[in-house]
From Swiss-Prot:
Key words of the record: DNA-directed RNA polymerase, Nucleotidyltransferase, Transcription, Transferase
Enzyme Commission (EC) number: 2.7.7.6
UniProt-listed NCBIfam families: PRK00405.1 (NF001616), rpoB (TIGR02013)
Annotated signal peptide: none
Enzyme's top EC category: transferase
Designated gene of the protein: rpoB
Organism: Rickettsia conorii (strain ATCC VR-613 / Malish 7)
CDD domains for the chain: RNA_pol_B_RPB2
PANTHER family: DNA-DIRECTED RNA POLYMERASE I SUBUNIT 2
Name of the protein: DNA-directed RNA polymerase subunit beta
Keyword Transport: no
GO BP term, example: DNA-templated transcription
Length: 1373
């Protein structure tokens, strides 16, 4: 068999990869995890369990919901519907087709259900199976995730944002002294389940403990304890210890000496040893823990206390008469002086009392005695009355309600996470499968709450990431599914009871619409299902990695306090402390850190390198915030020697609570993987982030997401090394699916013959259709360009095509431009930006924006609307761009008001005049009974038509344009099929040739003689089909040929079948909305050049608006004549403290000067003045070891590499581990520049040098989405507000500009009374004045008069609503 590796003539594509000079010192042991894996794992792996066999599916996600809802039985238990398995069919349309046809990308869910019918004997009650029916039931279309982690819903791309919410479990906290005037801390506990009722326990100001369910009226906690079955005695014995007082004749009582009960208190009486009678300490003295320990060690067992000491203590068991066994006082009662006398009289020798002291307060006992409920029944009825006020309370109903509240798995679910948290907080050992409350839980929650009040333990920190978890897509949709299936369950039970069960099939019982509507509602309207931010690839990735605290079950903006929004020590390595929106959502919407991932319980984990005996290993361990608290963790920049040992006497480590300690190297457990793990993806793209102020870094990371993809992309000279990862994971670029060789390339597609052979040894073919000028969600342009050439050898996951905002496989949001920091005639006042005309002329910051316009031809009451060129009362000039069908041509240049699609609508009949009758008789009916309802280009839009899509309803005849588009599409499908077949045929026939050459012919086509030996020349004379007719002597060869033919035929048949399916789908017509006959979509591309008013920004939060475009000859220039592109204001730096931009500028200056140096060396090499060794030496000096792979290649390739860096050398300065100031100076020296990075600059207008040296360098600038074209508009005639009669505001309403209070002051200051009057009356809301002014303009006059503004009338009406009748009285002067 021929090996495909034989004919790899190509050089690997990896040779084209960009090499950056990296300033990082820390060796990376862990790769950045896939940036959108959070979305894909959650939905595809955990929820759908898509490509997993039914038998291997775990009980989670969809599987667990179906298992929990089914089996469903009817009320009489005769019918039983069980779940067997589920599977997904293939989606009807692929992702691209769904977005084009405005459909949802979804797959039909087929669930196999088994209906068992039972026969029940009425006398004996025995059951036996009567019949079993199993059937596959369609349960609706379930949205699928695209390969980029998004959903296509109704044709638009949406993202489901992960939600941060409080983890289920029990939480203890206090009110910080806010409730009670004395500042006393009132402690409380809250049990938060994943699903079910909340349980709160709280102390009041009198130290009585209450509980409430779902924030209803509060009850005594002992009512709850009685409701779970505890008696008074059990309650007291569980929460209190007991001590026995023994009577010592004529001396008092002897009691066991327990040091902790009396330490740190002044003695009220002498401390006497009961056994010896010795006085150990006098009254009034303080007993210290050391003294107590000493006495205990010396054998002090019992101490003597005075007789009346018992007064005020509480009984720990019933006090009984020794003679009659009569109960004298109940357990828990306080011993009074009277009771003590009774004890003396009856000569009771032993009295058991509760241990109550400052370490153990009487709260439970006090609550017990305040509570009127004395038994379980009364307690349950009391709870019932609070939860169901107005309903009669009986014990069965109360019992059932209480059980359903906390102990029923159907209605209450703590979830596995909640159980784990509960066990760890209460120190219990209950199985993780028990996800309801237990009696032990409730008893121990009260115990811990009382201990907190007694000063033992600490309260929980709600903002700790161990107490907040992430609900990702899969879990959010799982919850919706559960709601839908619970609703469906009710309808199934109803149908079971209603129909004849014997004849019914499973599909008759299931109504899938209920489930579908719930899922649809979630994707369309939920606060967490959002329209994807698709401005550029970075904004897509960030949106998918966003964590929101808002949404259903989360916080609300208005009630979220400062603590929730603040950065917490546990955010380190998990949530980015920088990237969050400015404004009211600050801190509520966060971004996951670069290396963070979410574990199976929903907690965010961060990676660390394990340290063993002071030696750093390469083992990477992911820890959650809870686990991290147990260890000492060093920083990534801790000094490590060659053997991997931590250097230095002490290492700075993080410990629980966010504190830092200095420990010896052998005590360190872990160190950070990299300093970059602290920040998010957007922040990790900012070079010199460590030199920027945090507020500006926040703006920088937010503004990168608003950068518009430009026509010409340009990766930053000064990057951070993460650019490639972002481009790859965003899905903007095209990745090779398999190793292979490029067979064909054009701007629309790439064909690759793969090197992974099939079972039959034949190659498979990958065809990548590139996206050309597609519209994104934010009207930016998605366009992919191939990076490979024919013959290139590509490896799996190599980038073979660039997408929007990517350059050679790296993210490129802006352009490198030459900037100078200097004031220029006041044009860069307040962050304004001055740009050179070259930038506009050479389209440096030009971007393409695509607008979509849609017209629908509907079936109306009066008849169908029609797409046509035949429009009444429209000139031929207006129709010049339309084809014969009435749809605009592709490539037409259009401006506001032009017709895109001609459409006429039937109009109702109106009475006809005799003249009209005559005209109709002469010219026919048609022209009069329709009105023009064509699609026009809206105001403010102009550009080129780049695409037209026509969709026709099934059964409606297609027009010429639709047929032409269809034909074009079929040709494309056919080309894909033919190219694939050609590659397979080439392989098959060259294999056949190898087998046949040298064989002896037995039989064959006419051209060949029997007995002849086959040669290559002979085979060249035969057609491909005749190869199969040859029969040779060797039976083994014939067998092999037979196998090849079978495989070839199968392959060909499969290709034809796939082609036929695609064509059939294309020709079958479209599913259009109700009443629509035809839909035409027109896409117009507009080129936006940079102009004054556009917003630009750097990566460091330095933003500004363009103030002026200056001719090149007027701009400042360098001594070699290079003109500066952009002039920025140096005053924008000191107060903003984003110094990173200056370091970036200096390093950029080194970059272009090093590139010039390399170009000079290449020139000298070509002129044979120097050899290749000098170039190699300079490259090693510049790049270090990074460059070795290139230096080993032939000379031409080294020169070709040098040419690639001729515009600028690319640097990588990783966040917190990048170039220091000295490194920048070294680079400037290597480039032959002054280490200050400043140069002499010449003024373009005068030709003279500026007085001082100026900072000049290459800087990376972005053009943001806030374009002046989309902001400014002018109003001529437009709508007025109904009440005030003033023009509306805003571009969308075609509004006017408000002449506000300050503008009035300006006119007053100038004394321009008439102008002011005109502004406030006729130009605003004087209705009569407006009409008169219009009349006078029409008559060509210049005079007008103002009347009363409408707003004055509104004010009078407002007065009248207050019952004040205000009139305007005009008296003649």
């Amino acid at each position: 068999m021929v090996s495909l590796r034989d004919n790899i003539e190509a050089q690997p594509l990896s040779h084209n990869r960009r090499i950056r000079k990296n300033f990082g010192h820390i060796n990376l042991v862990a790769d950045i995890p896939n940036l959108i894996e959070i979305q894909k794992n959650s939905y595809e792996k955990n929820f759908l369990q898509l490509n997993i066999k039914d038998s291997e599916r775990k009980n989670k996600g969809l599987q667990s919901i179906l298992n929990s809802i089914f089996p469903i039985s009817d009320s009489s238990n005769i019918a039983n519907l069980e779940f067997v398995k589920y599977e997904f069919d293939t989606p009807k349309y692929d992702v691209e087709e769904c977005s084009q046809r405005s459909l949802s990308y979804a797959a039909p869910l087929k669930v196999t259900l088994r209906l068992s019918i039972w026969d029940i004997d009425e006398d004996t009650g025995t059951r036996e199976i009567k019949g079993i029916k199993e059937q596959e039931v369609y349960m609706g279309d379930i949205p699928l995730m695209t390969k980029n982690g998004t959903f296509i819903i109704n044709g638009t791309e949406r993202v489901v944002v992960s939600q941060m919410h409080r983890s289920p479990g029990v939480f203890f906290y206090h009110d910080e002294g806010k409730v009670h005037s004395s500042g006393k801390l009132l402690y409380s506990a809250r049990v938060i389940p994943y699903r079910g009722s909340w349980l709160d326990l709280e102390f009041d100001a009198k130290d009585v403990i209450y509980f409430r369910i779902d924030r209803k009226r509060k009850l005594y906690t002992t009512t709850l304890l009685r409701a779970i079955g505890m008696s008074t005695e059990e309650i007291i014995k569980f929460y209190y210890n007991s001590v026995t007082y023994k009577l010592v004749k004529n001396k008092g009582w002897a009691v066991k000496f327990i040091p902790q009960h009396i330490t740190a208190h002044r003695l009220t009486s002498d401390l006497v040893d009961a056994d010896t009678g010795n006085i150990l300490l006098k009254a009034g003295q303080k007993i210290t823990p050391r003294l107590a320990k000493k006495y205990s060690g010396e054998g002090l067992n019992n101490i003597l206390v005075a007789h009346e000491t018992l007064i005020g203590k509480y009984l720990s068991e019933d006090l009984r008469d020794p003679a009659s066994d009569e109960v004298l006082a109940k357990i828990g009662e306080m011993i009074t002086a009277d009771m003590l006398n009774v004890i003396n009289d009856l000569k009771i020798k032993n009295v058991n009392v509760l241990v109550i002291n400052p370490q153990s307060g009487p709260y439970i006992r006090n609550t017990l005695f305040a509570d009127k409920n004395q038994d379980r029944e009364a307690a349950l009825c009391d709870i019932f009355r609070v939860l169901r006020p107005g309903e009669p309370a009986n014990i069965e109903a109360a019992e059932s309600l209480f059980y359903n509240l906390f102990f029923d798995t159907e209605r209450y679910d703590l979830s596995e996470v909640g159980r784990i948290k509960m066990n760890s907080r209460l120190e219990l050992n209950i199985s993780e499968e028990v996800t309801v409350l237990t009696i032990d839980d409730i008893k121990n929650i009260v115990r811990v709450l009382v201990e907190l009040k007694d000063g033992k333990g600490i309260i929980d920190d709600i903002d700790h990431l161990g107490n907040r978890r992430v609900r990702s897509v899969g879990e959010l949709i799982e919850n919706q599914f559960r709601i839908g299936l619970v609703r469906m369950e009710k309808s199934v039970i109803e149908r079971m009871s209603a129909g004849d069960v014997d004849t019914v099939m499973p599909h008759d019982l299931v109504n899938s619409k209920i489930l579908v509507s719930v899922v649809k509602e979630f994707f369309s309207t939920s606060q967490l299902s959002q329209f994807m931010d698709q401005t550029n690839p970075l904004s897509e990735i960030t949106h998918k990695r966003r964590l929101s605290a808002l949404g259903p079950g989360g916080l609300s903006r208005d009630r979220a306090g400062f603590e929730v929004r603040d950065v917490h020590p546990t955010h380190y390595g998990r949530i980015c402390p920088i990237e969050t929106p400015e404004g009211q959502n600050i801190g509520l919407i966060n971004s996951m850190a670069t290396y963070a991932r979410i574990n199976k319980h929903g907690f965010i984990e961060s990676p660390y390198r394990r340290v063993k005996d002071g030696c750093v290993t390469d083992e990477v361990v992911y820890l959650s915030a809870i686990e991290e608290g147990k260890y000492k963790i060093g920083q990534a920049n801790s000094k490590i020697n060659k053997d991997g040992k931590l250097q230095g006497e002490f290492i700075n480590c993080r410990v629980e609570g966010g504190n830092f300690v200095m420990v010896e190297p052998y005590e360190v457990d872990f160190i950070d993987v990299t300093p970059m793990q602290v920040v998010s993806v957007a922040a990790s793209l900012i070079p010199f982030l460590e030199n920027d102020d945090a507020n500006r870094a926040l703006m920088g990371s937010n503004m990168q997401r608003q950068a518009v993809p430009l026509i010409k992309t340009d990766a930053p000279f000064v990057g951070t090394g993460v650019e490639g990862v972002v481009a790859k994971d965003s899905g903007a670029s095209v990745l090779a699916l398999h190793d292979g060789i490029v067979e064909q390339v054009d701007s629309n597609r790439i064909v690759i013959r793969t090197l992974e052979q099939k079972v039959d040894g034949s190659p498979s073919v990958d065809i990548y259709n590139l996206l050309k000028f597609q519209k994104s969600n934010h009207n930016t342009c998605i366009n992919q360009k191939p990076l490979v050439k024919v013959g290139h050898y590509v490896k799996k996951n190599d980038i073979i095509a660039d997408g929007p905002s990517t350059d050679n496989g790296e993210i490129a949001l802006g352009r490198n431009v030459l900037v100078a920091f200097l004031p220029w005639n006041g044009y860069n006042f307040e962050d304004s930006i001055l740009i050179s005309e070259r930038i506009v002329k050479e389209d440096v910051f030009t971007s393409i924006h695509i607008e979509e316009f849609e017209v629908i031809a509907r079936d109306t009451r009066l008849g169908p609307e029609e797409i046509t060129r035949d429009i009444p009362n429209v000139s031929e000039e207006a129709l010049r761009h339309l084809d014969e069908v009435g749809i605009i041509y592709i490539g037409a240049e259009v401006k506001a008001g032009d017709i895109l699609v001609g459409k006429v609508t039937p109009k109702s009949e109106s009475p006809i005049t005799p003249e009209e009758k005559l005209l109709r008789a002469i010219f026919g009916e048609k022209a009069f009974d329709v009105k023009d309802s064509s699609l026009h280009v809206p105001s403010g839009v102009s550009g080129t038509v780049v695409e037209v899509r026509v969709f026709s309803r099934r059964g409606v005849e297609k027009d010429q344009r639709a047929i032409a588009i269809e034909k074009q599409q079929i040709e494309k499908f056919a080309k894909d099929r033919d190219d694939e077949l050609e590659i397979i045929e080439h392989f098959v026939f060259s294999w056949l040739e190898k087998l046949l050459v040298g064989q002896v012919i037995i039989n064959g086509p006419k051209q060949v003689k029997v007995g002849q030996t086959i040669t290559t020349e002979m085979l060249k004379g035969l057609s491909k089909g005749q190869f199969w007719q040859i029969i040779v002597e060797d039976a083994n060869v014939m067998n092999e040929i037979e196998q090849i033919k079978t495989h070839y035929d199968e392959k060909k048949e499969a290709l034809d079948k796939r082609f036929a399916t695609k064509v059939e789908k294309l020709q079958s017509g479209d599913d259009l909305p109700q009443g629509a006959l035809k839909v035409v979509k027109v896409f117009i591309a507009t080129k936006h050049k940079l102009q004054p008013g556009d917003k630009m920004a750097g990566r460091h939060g330095n933003k500004g608006v363009i103030s002026r475009i200056v001719p090149e000859e007027d701009m400042p220039f360098l001594e070699d004549g290079t003109v500066v592109d952009i002039v920025l204001n140096p005053l924008g730096l000191p107060s903003r403290m984003n110094i990173g931009q200056i370091l970036e500028t200096h390093l950029g200056w080194a970059s272009i000067n090093l590139a010039k140096k390399i170009s000079t060396l290449v020139k000298e090499y070509k002129n044979k003045h120097i050899g290749i060794e000098q170039i190699k030496k300079f490259l090693i000096e510049l790049y270090g070891e990074n460059i070795n792979s290139i230096l080993e290649r032939p000379e031409e390739e080294i020169i070709s590499f040098c040419k690639k860096v001729s515009k600028g050398v690319h640097f990588a300065t990783p966040v917190f581990d990048g170039a220091k100031v000295q490194d920048v100076k070294d680079m400037l020296k290597l480039a032959g520049q002054d280490p200050s990075g400043q140069v002499k600059l010449i003024d373009g207008r005068t030709g003279e040098y500026f007085d001082r040296l100026v900072t000049v360098g290459q800087k990376y600038l972005l053009k943001l989405h806030h374009l002046v074209d989309n902001k400014i508009h002018s109003r001529s005639i437009g709508p007025y507000s109904l009440v005030t009669q003033q023009p509306l505001g805003g571009k969308s309403h075609f509004g006017g500009q408000r002449f506000g209070e300050m503008e009035c002051w300006a006119l007053q200051a100038y004394g321009a009374a008439y102008t002011l009057q005109e502004m406030l009356t006729v130009k605003s809301d004087d209705v009569n004045g407006r009409i008169k002014t219009y009349d006078s303009i029409v008559r060509g006059e210049n005079n007008f008069e103002s009347g009363i503004p409408e707003s004055f009338n509104v004010m009078i009406k407002e007065f009248r609503s207050l019952c004040l009748n205000v009139k305007l009285e005009v008296t003649s002067s």
